[in-house]
Every structure is written in C-alpha cells, then in structure tokens.
A protein has these predicted regions:
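Hydrophobic alpha-helical segments
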Residues: 1-192
Length: 192
C-alpha cells in the first residue's frame, strides 16, 4: 500500500468553473504555507481502518499527487469509513478535480485543501461517475454532504452545482456516505 504523509502547499480559492471542483470561493489565492501539522492523531481504531486500505489509487493523471488516508469519525467517536485520498492542493489540481478519472475505487477519494474556510461551489463538469461531495470546516467537522449523480448522456455536468462552506472538500464515490452512515457533524481525520 502506498501511504505518504502529505506536505502540502495550501493555496486559497480560485474563482473559476471547476470539474468536480470549486467554482466560487471567499479564500485568497495568493498565500501558500508548507505544513506537516495533523488535524488530529489517529486512534487505534482509525489506524486499523487505514492499515486495511489498499486501493489502486491514485492512478493516471493523479499518480504523482501526494496522498493521505482520510478517516471519518462519527459524533460517537466510532470510525465510519476510511479511504486513501489524492490531495488537490493547488489551483490547477483543484480545477482538474476528478474530471480526468474514468472511475475511482471505493477506497479512494480526493481531498481539496484551502488555506481558510470559505463559501465554495463544486460542479460535476466532465465527470464519468457520481460523487459524494463533503464540505468540512477548519477542524474537519462535516458541514454539508451532497450526493451528486454523474452527468446525463448529453450533459457536461457544468450546470450541476453543489455549494457549501468549508476549508476542506472531500470527494468519494457516490453513496459512500450513505453506505458508511456518514452525516453532518461527523469529522474528517487526516494528516496534512
């Protein structure tokens, strides 16, 4: 299994139409910071969930992306689910989003990082599969969940908009949140 701790350059928002990505933001695009500070330490249960992950992800245009395991912790403290996420931490990576992927394994995802909490809108432009789009605030608390279907046969997905407020946007395969009993108020736990 390929697990790397993320050393991310965090960049602010980019007001543009993005595929499976942000289209509007209140964040500033000028500042970048390098950090290795974790949002939270993994518990033994979370570490066990991460150790079981072995997806063939990321691949293709995402193969060079940094990755981080992301665990969702329920309000009761229990682990809801875990995936290995490719990290989209630059304007170009956030713009591309998952639109170049034909599929993604159930144990894979993408974590979009921003320097601060902001209002953002993600779209399904050029997506080949449906997503759950999860917004989380600065401490990883989930604020919004959207279950976004793939665009129709004659659609490009640009009109499928999913707004939310957060510092992190986490995308997983559609219905992953339902299958794992994830809800608003649960928390994303990862190292960044």
């Amino acid at each position: 299994m390929r697990r790397r701790h993320l050393i991310a350059l965090l960049a602010g928002g980019l007001p543009a139409a993005l595929a499976g990505c942000q289209t509007d933001s209140t964040a500033d695009d000028a500042a970048t910071n390098e950090t290795t500070v974790g949002i939270d330490a993994f518990t033994d249960e979370e570490r066990a969930a991460v150790d079981r992950l072995d997806p063939a992800w990321p691949t293709g245009p995402y193969a060079s992306y940094e990755t981080t395991p992301v665990v969702v912790r329920g309000a009761d403290g229990g682990v809801r689910g875990a995936v290995v996420a490719a990290v989209a931490d630059t304007p170009d990576k956030r713009r591309l989003g998952l639109s170049a992927a034909e599929s993604m394994p159930a144990a894979g995802g993408m974590l979009f990082t921003y320097e601060s909490v902001g209002d953002r809108t993600y779209v399904m432009r050029d997506m080949s599969f449906g997503l759950d789009i999860i917004y989380a605030d600065a401490d990883g608390t989930i604020t919004t969940i959207h279950n976004a279907p793939a665009p129709g046969p004659d659609e490009n997905g640009a009109s499928q908009t999913y707004p939310g407020r957060g510092q992190y946007v986490f995308e997983v395969t559609r219905n992953w949140t339902t299958d794992n009993n994830v809800s608003v108020g649960d928390r994303l736990v990862f190292t960044r």
